[in-house]
């Protein structure tokens, strides 16, 4: 039986830059794109060419000089404005001129958000979504529709939330991304809704979670279990407020826990180096207790734990750290015990044993 593959859309350059303190120069962005391509993600959402001149320059450079092996660049934009034809919308024109073959378009999936925030009638919001998807599709772009506030909108008015997806699909969208924009939806609710949407639509479903309730990774995995075939997230979980789904957690969970293919074979071992490289580009300290990629993820301090993990790795390690490019650390402390000390000593004196006089004396 063939291994199920999950698409990965990295949005570090779009959603990630909304995190407090994260600023990338154009050179940084190009380095980040190359690092993500080397890691092997499917898509890189590289920014908004209409609202950010730096992003427009990135797409110009990519069009002329950037040759990617694994990833495809996507440009981010909004639906057409209310009361305007799609062909007259400057933001949509910028997407076409970016040279990107994929447009990630965000539109409101909540009836109250459409009415109270965008200021348009619910019917006009649906027309904006459909017109935008159709215009871009007819001009040669693939459209990924980001249904903003989808889970909140579904709780509020399920029929209307689903109608926004129907509008996108009628316009030719090739992915329907369900967004937990406020980051407060429980994984069980995400599973239930994604299952219903995936069963209803022939267009593949994607999941886009924020971490405001500490549930972004769990919600993402629940969505994949329910039928989502694309995951959207950021390296190190960078994103506005509390961040986005952290691909440094999601990627190994998908591959090592769920048995799915998310990256080219063997590329998961690049994850730790990629996470550190991007944290350096962002000028942010790495969270050393981050699962999988932090220096402390496989650090052992207690004497009994060190003794146990040296005898059997799975005593206190849920995976081999090498699978994600990390390594085990045995910490010397007042609670470390003889096993930790001996392991460190044997690096310089291989002949020592637990019973050696020098070991006992130390």
List where the protein language model places each region.
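A glycine-rich helix N-cap at a beta->alpha junction
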Residues: 69-76
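Metal-centered catalytic cores of metalloenzymes
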Residues: 1-2, 165, 192-199, 221-224, ...
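Flexible glycine/proline-rich, aromatic-decorated loop/lid segments
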Residues: 215-231, 238-253, 296-320
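Alpha/beta enzyme core
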Residues: 3-8, 15-44, 51, 61-68, ...
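A mid-to-C-terminal "edge-of-domain" accessory segment
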Residues: 5-6, 12, 252, 258-362
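Histidine-centered catalytic micro-motifs
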Residues: 205-212, 219, 233
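Hydrophobic alpha-helical scaffolding
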Residues: 22, 48-52, 81, 122, ...
């Amino acid at each position: 039986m063939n291994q199920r593959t999950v698409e990965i859309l990295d949005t570090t350059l779009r959603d990630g830059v909304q995190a407090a303190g994260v600023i990338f120069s154009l050179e940084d962005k190009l380095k980040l794109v190359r690092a993500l391509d080397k890691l092997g993600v499917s898509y890189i959402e590289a920014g908004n060419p209409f609202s950010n001149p730096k992003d427009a320059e990135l797409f110009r450079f990519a069009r002329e000089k950037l040759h990617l092996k694994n990833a495809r660049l996507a440009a981010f934009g909004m639906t057409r404005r209310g009361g305007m034809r799609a062909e007259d919308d400057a933001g949509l024109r910028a997407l076409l001129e970016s040279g990107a073959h994929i447009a990630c378009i965000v539109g409101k999936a909540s009836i109250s958000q459409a009415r109270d925030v965008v200021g348009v009638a619910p019917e006009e919001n649906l027309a904006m979504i459909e017109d935008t998807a159709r215009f871009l599709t007819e001009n040669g772009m693939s459209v990924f529709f980001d249904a903003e506030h989808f889970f909140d909108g579904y709780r509020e008015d399920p029929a209307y939330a689903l109608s926004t997806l129907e509008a996108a699909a009628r316009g030719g969208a090739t992915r329907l991304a369900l967004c937990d924009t406020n980051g407060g939806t429980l994984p069980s609710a995400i599973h239930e809704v994604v299952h219903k949407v995936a069963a209803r639509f022939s267009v593949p479903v994607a999941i886009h979670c924020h971490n405001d309730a500490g549930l972004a990774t769990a919600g993402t995995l629940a969505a994949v279990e329910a039928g989502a075939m694309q995951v959207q997230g950021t390296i190190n979980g960078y994103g506005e407020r509390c961040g986005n789904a952290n691909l440094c957690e999601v990627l190994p969970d998908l591959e090592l826990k769920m048995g799915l293919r998310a990256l080219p074979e063997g590329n998961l071992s690049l994850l730790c180096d990629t996470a550190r490289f991007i944290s350096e580009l962002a000028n942010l300290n790495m969270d050393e207790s981050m699962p999988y990629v932090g220096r402390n993820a496989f650090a052992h301090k207690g004497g009994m734990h060190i003794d146990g993990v040296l005898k059997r790795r799975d005593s206190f390690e849920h995976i081999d750290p090498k699978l994600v490019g990390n390594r085990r650390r045995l910490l010397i402390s007042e609670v470390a015990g003889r096993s930790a000390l001996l392991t460190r000593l044997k690096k310089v004196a291989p002949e020592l044993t637990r019973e050696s006089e020098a070991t006992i004396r130390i």
